[in-house]
Curated annotation (Swiss-Prot):
UniProt cross-references to Pfam families, sorted A to Z: Maf
Entry's EC annotation: 3.6.1.9
Gene name of the record: maf
Keywords, comma-separated and alphabetical: Cytoplasm, Hydrolase, Nucleotide metabolism
Protein name stated in the entry: dTTP/UTP pyrophosphatase
Protein family: Belongs to the Maf family. YhdE subfamily.
One GO BP: nucleotide metabolic process
Example of a GO MF term: UTP diphosphatase activity
Function: Nucleoside triphosphate pyrophosphatase that hydrolyzes dTTP and UTP. May have a dual role in cell division arrest and in preventing the incorporation of modified nucleotides into cellular nucleic acids.
HAMAP family: Maf
Site (Important for substrate specificity): R12, T70, Q152
PANTHER family from the UniProt entry: BIFUNCTIONAL DTTP/UTP PYROPHOSPHATASE/METHYLTRANSFERASE PROTEIN-RELATED, BIFUNCTIONAL DTTP_UTP PYROPHOSPHATASE_METHYLTRANSFERASE PROTEIN-RELATED
Cofactor field: a divalent metal cation
Catalytic-site annotation from UniProt: D69
Length: 191
């Protein structure tokens, strides 16, 4: 059986694959995450996911390679990972009391087939006080996450409502991924 390789160092993506009993290895893609001129957030995440998977698949062509990327958008503004605490605070203030979208794109590459897809989830935040934001940033949790929060961590206390796939917001739409893997003769639903 061909190995599945996760082209990501994300501990959250690793945990989600383990949760679904997907057997895999990790080879971190060294692709620089730069957002070029794309027409939509879905194009951005699918393109970045494909770039990451392609970089690893180039040297692992006998296996199935998964790449993924997540971004947060608010009113056409893309919120990636903050570069510092001040930017994290600005993002959280922007999202406070509002609904934003989280896009996660996935690419699955094998020698004979490539599949890309994305999931879009709406997340609504409660109104956040400056004290709440400052305390959260002090934890350092938001500094490596798109939109400056982790819904699976302490950032969960900011979420008033979610519409869509929770796991996509975490970083990998695992339910859809498991279904897409069936196209590659990988079925973990009976494992």
């Amino acid at each position: 059986m061909r190995k599945i390789i996760l082209a990501s160092g994300s501990p959250r993506r690793k945990e989600l694959l383990e949760l679904a009993s997907v057997p895999f290895e990790i080879i971190v893609s060294e692709v620089e995450e730069t957002i070029g001129a794309y027409s939509s957030p879905s194009d951005i995440v699918m393109s970045l996911a494909l770039q990451k998977a392609s970089a690893v698949a180039e040297y692992n062509s006998d296996h199935i390679v998964l790449g993924a990327d997540t971004i947060v958008t608010y009113e056409s503004r893309i919120l990636g990972k903050p570069s510092n605490e001040a930017e994290a605070k600005e993002m959280l203030q922007l999202l406070s009391g509002k609904t934003h979208e989280v896009y996660t794109g996935v690419a699955i590459i094998a020698k004979d087939k490539t599949v890309t897809f994305y999931e879009r989830t709406e997340v609504t935040f409660w109104e956040l006080t400056e004290e709440e934001i400052d305390a959260y940033i002090a934890l350092k949790e938001p500094l490596d996450k798109a939109g400056s929060y982790g819904i699976q961590g302490k950032g969960s206390i900011f979420v008033q409502h979610i519409q869509g796939d929770y796991y996509s917001v975490v970083g990998l739409p695992i339910s859809r991924l498991v279904r897409e893997l069936k196209q590659f003769n990988i079925d973990v639903t009976h494992a």
